[in-house]
């Protein structure tokens, strides 16, 4: 099996085998554009994203040292103590620890829910804590993230243009990055994954990975097309396609190397420790790394070829 994969990689590098990324550029870019449009429409059709309490605001309770960590017990206790409570979410965030989130409660309702959770899980009063999270905190995080995203894109455009000495690679790289972030967020909206500050951090981190993957491919393209004007053995499109195929195995291997530890963290965070910061961050990274690789291969490289082939 290993020898077969090694031979496959050698065949791609030598050009004996290849995938027609450049020849299929129109279809690939059209499909990518369709995915972006759908990713934008999904939250509109579904009525928005599944936002964490940091963004929507509300009351939060944490019950520690729980013997029976059944979330249904907590949900029933909350509904009975405060029937007016909206958007009730009870989750396991660690072994023996329950977190309950809901819309903002009054002082009397907060006391009633706290007592109900204490009785339902048979814990002491000091093992139940409550807090109120205002939506302004999440709004501030979102604003800072958007500002960071804009600066990231601007700096990437300038840096790529200077490094590769062509604005067309810069624009193509940004197209791949935008595809990555928009489709990742759209997938979150489609599946209903909760968007928390940790997920936002994961989204921004994925952009760095996607950019690295794109730079590797573009470096190979620049190497293959250097001095092509004085050569007659191949066309520009053929050399771009060869470069993408030569770096294909590396891109896939890099993705796998990144996904394996992130997947392990996701498994530990979700199945063993329950919902929480670890799960939110690793889920965003897991989804984003996969989409980021596709963005490089199916968007950035074909877009650059499309911009240059018309010259």
Enumerate the predicted regions with their spans.
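A structural signal for conserved, well-ordered secondary-structure elements
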Residues: 1-311
